[in-house]
Amino acid sequence: KAKPKNLEKLKKFPITVLVCGNDKINIKNLLKILKQKKIKNILLEGGGITNWTFVKENLVDDIIITVTPYLVGGNTATTLVDGTGFSKIIGSTKLKLKNVRKVKNEITLHYECV
């Protein structure tokens, strides 16, 4: 949930802020509003919960993952997808590797959801 003080800070920028839901994002309402505004593509840079919400609703076309040379983790580390997840691999989203790119000391993997 966006804090009111953070929403207030955004007012100084030439952007439109969409509030879609009370305590969490109402994805279907958000996509309906974006469609009305003729927006057909979005870049989702969410946390694990937001990412999982879009994946479980089959709303993701591509996934781009950057592998960096840092080891982080632990019990409270952010994950790519959070929430209930898929109980079995057979039911999970299938990915097809489209591209691999190396930039300096990082590797970017571009997958298509099939």
Per-segment meaning from a language model:
Residues 1-43, 47-114:
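Enzymes that bind and transform nitrogen-containing heteroaromatic metabolites
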